[in-house]
Amino acid sequence: MFIIKTFNMLNASSKFAICGLPLRVDSYKTCAFGCEYCFANNRKIMEFGKSLQIGNITSVRKRLERIFHGSGAKDGNLIDNLIASGITWHCGGMSDPFQPCEEKYGISARLMELTKEFGISVLFSTKSDTIYDANPDRELHTFQMSVTCLEPNALEPNVPTPESRYEFYRSLKDAGYRVGIRMQPFIPFVTDERIVELYCDADHFTIEGLKLVPQNREHVQRVLEMTGIPKGAFTQMGLLNLRPEIRYELYKPIVRELEYYAIPYSIADNDMHHLSRSKCCCGDALIAKSSGFDNTAMCYEHGREYTLDDVKQCLGCIGECKANQLFTSNRQEGCVTVRDFYEKRFDRKSSPFSPKFLCEFDHIPTDEWEE
């Protein structure tokens, strides 16, 4: 008898300083959509090359019952304290929650039912055109659809057609659900402002440029050949990112359209968080609560010159939570708690949550005369 393995589906992200939704939940360890540009696939984060594994819902339930009906959140436990604080969960950051295997296993549907029971809000990110038999709650469950192009593209070999995904979007909106659009990755010569025109009643837009995994040379070469982008257009910032001056020019027509339709938006590139118009890069309209101490929130509240003291005032008990387990031993630098990591790395120009990391551009012009 073949037994499907399970895995711990609820985790705290090591990107807690740059992401307002550091509680990450994934239903599956695989992704059938097979997007060529997927960094999770090409960094082997979710073990995509191995057999399908499904999220362990039972372990999530036990944790929630302990936190809300038992002994409470454990002191110093980052996941426990993030949950207890009421932060929205993000489902689908590493693998799609509504890929075809959802029809058989229904892990995402079960997650919806469990979070309804405990009153937990969840943002689901997907490229799918269906949620199968899932029954989301309009108040607790929101959606973020990833849209890179409006024509079928070899970069997304197994993704449903753009037409069917728009019909899915339309059905969610017409049923009263909040839905955002994530233009990620934003690919030169592929992604353009027509996406804004089509999804002009979206609750939020997030823009984030194409990123490549430098250690995976085969992946880099394949994507460069498929997109026609020269390698010189990229600069290394951990991953290979399009140069900020290139992204700045590419985003201008998108931002103009977003301003025209009065759609709130965020720039999710780490060096451009200060250009966002929302406190959370996934969209304030799509969440119940973000952490509030990430750098997008700091830029929104204090401007690009926010200080370490500004961050510390928002940390609360999270600052004393253990976070070293989120990093490999060679990246811990003796730090143990969330507060330790901030104090050690905040002033480094290479640190994505430092104001020194932000690009030189202060805003994106929305009118021709501003240029």
Predicted regions span which residues?
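Auxiliary Fe-S-binding modules of radical SAM enzymes
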Residues: 2, 195-371
